[in-house]
Protein backbone atom coordinates (compact mmCIF):
# COMPACT_ATOMS: atom_id res chain seq x y z
CA UNK A 1 0.00 0.00 0.00
CA UNK A 2 1.29 3.45 -0.88
CA UNK A 3 1.93 5.70 2.09
CA UNK A 4 2.54 9.42 2.43
CA UNK A 5 5.64 11.13 3.75
CA UNK A 6 4.66 11.49 7.41
CA UNK A 7 6.95 14.49 7.77
CA UNK A 8 4.31 16.61 6.04
CA UNK A 9 2.23 16.20 9.18
CA UNK A 10 4.91 18.02 11.17
CA UNK A 11 4.45 21.25 9.23
CA UNK A 12 2.84 24.10 11.11
CA UNK A 13 -0.74 25.04 10.22
CA UNK A 14 0.11 26.81 6.98
CA UNK A 15 2.86 28.28 4.83
CA UNK A 16 3.77 31.75 6.06
CA UNK A 17 2.66 33.92 3.16
CA UNK A 18 -0.81 32.40 2.59
CA UNK A 19 -1.32 32.65 6.35
CA UNK A 20 -0.35 36.34 6.27
CA UNK A 21 -2.79 36.88 3.39
CA UNK A 22 -5.57 35.10 5.30
CA UNK A 23 -5.04 37.15 8.45
CA UNK A 24 -4.75 40.38 6.47
CA UNK A 25 -8.04 39.72 4.67
CA UNK A 26 -9.73 38.96 7.99
CA UNK A 27 -8.38 42.15 9.57
CA UNK A 28 -9.45 44.28 6.59
CA UNK A 29 -12.94 42.83 6.79
CA UNK A 30 -13.13 43.92 10.42
CA UNK A 31 -11.54 47.31 9.70
CA UNK A 32 -13.00 48.56 6.40
CA UNK A 33 -11.55 51.73 4.96
CA UNK A 34 -8.16 51.35 6.67
CA UNK A 35 -5.21 51.07 4.26
CA UNK A 36 -2.75 48.25 4.85
CA UNK A 37 0.95 48.62 4.07
CA UNK A 38 1.91 45.15 2.85
CA UNK A 39 5.39 43.93 3.77
CA UNK A 40 4.81 40.26 2.96
CA UNK A 41 5.74 38.77 -0.41
CA UNK A 42 8.12 41.06 -2.29
CA UNK A 43 6.06 41.20 -5.47
CA UNK A 44 7.34 43.06 -8.51
CA UNK A 45 5.97 46.51 -9.29
CA UNK A 46 7.81 47.75 -12.39
CA UNK A 47 7.36 46.80 -16.05
CA UNK A 48 9.98 44.82 -17.96
CA UNK A 49 12.66 47.14 -19.41
CA UNK A 50 12.79 47.50 -23.22
CA UNK A 51 15.99 45.43 -23.52
CA UNK A 52 14.33 42.46 -21.81
CA UNK A 53 11.18 42.84 -23.92
CA UNK A 54 13.24 42.83 -27.13
CA UNK A 55 15.31 39.82 -26.10
CA UNK A 56 12.24 37.78 -25.14
CA UNK A 57 10.47 38.66 -28.37
CA UNK A 58 13.53 37.72 -30.44
CA UNK A 59 13.73 34.36 -28.70
CA UNK A 60 10.02 33.69 -29.19
CA UNK A 61 10.29 34.59 -32.89
CA UNK A 62 13.14 32.08 -33.27
CA UNK A 63 11.12 29.39 -31.53
CA UNK A 64 8.24 30.15 -33.89
CA UNK A 65 10.31 29.28 -36.98
CA UNK A 66 11.31 25.67 -37.74
CA UNK A 67 14.62 26.89 -39.21
CA UNK A 68 15.69 28.48 -35.91
CA UNK A 69 13.75 26.34 -33.43
CA UNK A 70 16.12 24.89 -30.82
CA UNK A 71 14.00 22.46 -28.78
CA UNK A 72 14.91 21.78 -25.17
CA UNK A 73 17.68 23.87 -23.68
CA UNK A 74 20.80 22.56 -22.00
CA UNK A 75 20.22 20.74 -18.72
CA UNK A 76 22.19 23.35 -16.75
CA UNK A 77 20.64 26.26 -18.65
CA UNK A 78 21.46 27.73 -22.06
CA UNK A 79 25.19 27.69 -22.69
CA UNK A 80 25.27 31.22 -24.08
CA UNK A 81 23.62 32.54 -20.91
CA UNK A 82 26.11 30.75 -18.65
CA UNK A 83 28.98 32.07 -20.77
CA UNK A 84 27.57 35.59 -20.47
CA UNK A 85 27.51 35.20 -16.69
CA UNK A 86 31.17 34.17 -16.73
CA UNK A 87 31.99 37.40 -18.57
CA UNK A 88 29.91 39.43 -16.12
CA UNK A 89 31.84 38.15 -13.11
CA UNK A 90 35.16 38.95 -14.79
CA UNK A 91 34.34 42.62 -14.17
CA UNK A 92 34.80 41.92 -10.46
CA UNK A 93 37.98 39.90 -10.87
CA UNK A 94 36.18 36.58 -10.34
CA UNK A 95 37.16 33.68 -12.60
CA UNK A 96 34.46 31.05 -13.15
CA UNK A 97 33.57 28.38 -15.69
CA UNK A 98 30.19 27.96 -17.45
CA UNK A 99 29.86 24.56 -15.76
CA UNK A 100 29.76 26.30 -12.37
CA UNK A 101 26.40 27.92 -13.16
CA UNK A 102 22.96 26.34 -13.05
CA UNK A 103 20.06 28.33 -14.48
CA UNK A 104 16.83 27.70 -12.59
CA UNK A 105 13.48 29.34 -11.90
CA UNK A 106 14.70 31.06 -8.74
CA UNK A 107 16.24 30.72 -5.30
CA UNK A 108 13.08 29.44 -3.63
CA UNK A 109 13.00 26.20 -5.62
CA UNK A 110 16.75 25.71 -5.30
CA UNK A 111 16.75 26.37 -1.56
CA UNK A 112 14.01 23.77 -1.13
CA UNK A 113 15.42 21.17 -3.52
CA UNK A 114 19.11 21.25 -2.62
CA UNK A 115 18.43 19.60 0.75
CA UNK A 116 17.51 16.41 -1.10
CA UNK A 117 21.16 15.61 -1.80
CA UNK A 118 21.96 15.51 1.92
CA UNK A 119 21.15 12.68 4.33
CA UNK A 120 18.27 12.96 6.80
CA UNK A 121 20.66 12.69 9.75
CA UNK A 122 22.34 16.04 9.06
CA UNK A 123 21.93 18.66 11.79
CA UNK A 124 20.51 21.87 10.33
CA UNK A 125 21.23 25.41 11.52
CA UNK A 126 19.06 28.20 10.19
CA UNK A 127 19.28 31.95 10.57
CA UNK A 128 16.28 33.26 12.51
CA UNK A 129 14.34 35.10 11.25
CA UNK A 130 14.80 34.06 7.64
CA UNK A 131 12.91 32.95 4.56
CA UNK A 132 10.56 30.11 5.67
CA UNK A 133 11.36 27.67 2.85
CA UNK A 134 14.68 26.72 4.50
CA UNK A 135 12.89 25.30 7.53
CA UNK A 136 9.83 23.86 5.79
CA UNK A 137 11.83 21.94 3.17
CA UNK A 138 14.03 20.32 5.82
CA UNK A 139 11.00 19.41 7.91
CA UNK A 140 9.60 17.56 4.90
CA UNK A 141 13.06 16.05 4.38
CA UNK A 142 12.90 14.48 7.83
CA UNK A 143 15.60 16.50 9.61
CA UNK A 144 13.45 17.93 12.38
CA UNK A 145 11.48 16.82 15.36
CA UNK A 146 7.96 18.00 16.07
CA UNK A 147 6.83 21.61 16.04
CA UNK A 148 7.13 23.19 19.47
CA UNK A 149 4.25 25.66 19.72
CA UNK A 150 5.56 27.19 22.95
CA UNK A 151 8.82 28.22 21.30
CA UNK A 152 7.33 28.56 17.80
CA UNK A 153 10.24 26.45 16.56
CA UNK A 154 10.90 22.89 15.45
CA UNK A 155 12.75 20.54 17.75
CA UNK A 156 15.98 19.26 16.24
CA UNK A 157 16.96 22.44 14.41
CA UNK A 158 19.63 24.85 15.60
CA UNK A 159 18.20 28.36 15.34
CA UNK A 160 20.75 31.16 14.91
CA UNK A 161 18.55 33.72 16.62
CA UNK A 162 19.22 37.38 15.92
CA UNK A 163 17.97 40.54 17.59
CA UNK A 164 17.63 44.25 16.98
CA UNK A 165 20.32 44.88 19.60
CA UNK A 166 22.75 42.82 17.51
CA UNK A 167 21.67 44.45 14.22
CA UNK A 168 20.02 41.12 13.27
CA UNK A 169 23.44 39.67 12.38
CA UNK A 170 23.84 35.94 13.17
CA UNK A 171 26.92 34.34 14.69
CA UNK A 172 28.22 30.81 14.04
CA UNK A 173 26.79 27.92 16.06
CA UNK A 174 28.47 26.99 19.32
CA UNK A 175 27.81 23.28 18.80
CA UNK A 176 28.27 20.90 15.88
CA UNK A 177 25.98 21.31 12.85
CA UNK A 178 26.21 20.00 9.29
CA UNK A 179 24.10 22.35 7.15
CA UNK A 180 23.94 26.11 7.67
CA UNK A 181 21.34 28.29 5.95
CA UNK A 182 22.31 31.95 5.62
CA UNK A 183 20.18 34.66 4.00
CA UNK A 184 22.28 37.75 3.26
CA UNK A 185 20.97 40.41 2.77
CA UNK A 186 18.43 38.95 5.12
CA UNK A 187 14.77 38.42 4.36
CA UNK A 188 12.84 39.82 6.22
CA UNK A 189 15.11 42.11 8.28
CA UNK A 190 17.23 43.54 5.46
CA UNK A 191 20.36 43.17 7.62
CA UNK A 192 23.63 42.71 5.71
CA UNK A 193 26.58 40.82 7.18
CA UNK A 194 30.02 42.24 6.38
CA UNK A 195 33.07 40.33 5.16
CA UNK A 196 34.34 39.39 8.59
CA UNK A 197 30.91 38.26 9.78
CA UNK A 198 30.50 35.96 6.77
CA UNK A 199 34.11 34.75 7.10
CA UNK A 200 33.35 33.58 10.64
CA UNK A 201 30.80 31.14 9.19
CA UNK A 202 33.20 30.00 6.47
CA UNK A 203 35.88 29.33 9.08
CA UNK A 204 33.34 27.36 11.14
CA UNK A 205 32.26 25.34 8.09
CA UNK A 206 35.85 24.45 7.19
CA UNK A 207 36.69 23.45 10.75
CA UNK A 208 33.54 21.33 11.15
CA UNK A 209 33.19 20.02 7.58
CA UNK A 210 29.81 21.73 7.34
CA UNK A 211 28.07 23.03 4.21
CA UNK A 212 26.78 26.60 3.94
CA UNK A 213 23.69 27.11 1.79
CA UNK A 214 23.94 30.81 1.03
CA UNK A 215 20.94 32.69 -0.32
Give the positions of each predicted feature.
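Short, basic/glycine-rich phosphate-binding loops at helix/coil junctions
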Residues: 1-3, 181
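N-terminal small-domain helix-loop-helix segment of the aminotransferase-like
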Residues: 3-6, 10-105, 113
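Residues at helix C-cap/C′ positions in short coil/turn segments immediately following an alpha-helix
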Residues: 32, 208-209
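Generic enzyme active-site microenvironment
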Residues: 213
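Conserved core of the PLP fold type I
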Residues: 65-208
Amino acid sequence: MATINANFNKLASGYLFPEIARRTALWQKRNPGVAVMRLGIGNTTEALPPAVQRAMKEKIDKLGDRRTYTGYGDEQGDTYLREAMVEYYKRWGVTLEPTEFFISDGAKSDAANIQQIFGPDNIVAVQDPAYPVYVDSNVVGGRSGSYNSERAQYDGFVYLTTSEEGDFIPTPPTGKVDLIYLCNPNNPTGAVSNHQEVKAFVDYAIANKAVIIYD
